[in-house]
Amino acid sequence: MEHLVLTIDDSRTMRDMLRLTLTGAGFRVVQANDGAHGLEVLEAENPDLVVTDINMPIMDGFGFIEHARRLSAHRVTPILVLTTEANAEKKARARRAGATGWIVKPFNPEKLVTVLRKVAP
């Protein structure tokens, strides 16, 4: 069964790269351009996994994770952070919010796919 992945990033280029990588690995992909849009897609599409950036307009990745974890249907949905941030404080904040893991951009496509398959329900 193909897992459905929600990718959230304000960069169209990054969304395109994620779609290409993940569909090539057999995942189905839905996308959002910020955390607020991500919450709409999360509730409408009910993805199996989420990959989110941190630094985005309207609602950042921390806000998205915190809101997603308040939704009973997504309390345990794996949420990976994919960001240029390497700051230990931000990484700890993401974990406290409920992130499953953290990958720093630029990402290695094979590593991302491996991690997603590992945490997939």
Sequence positions of predicted segments:
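Receiver (REC) domain active-site loop signature in two-component systems and cognate sites
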Residues: M56
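Short, glycine/charged-rich "phosphate-handling" switch motifs in NTP-dependent
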Residues: T100
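Short hydrophobic/Thr-rich beta-strand motif most characteristic of the beta2 strand and flanking loop
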Residues: G26-N33, V41
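Conserved acidic segment of CheY-like receiver
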Residues: E2-T13, L18-L22, V50
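Active-site beta3 strand of CheY-like receiver
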Residues: E45-V51
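Active-site residues of response regulator receiver
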Residues: D53, T83
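C-terminal output helix
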Residues: F107-L116
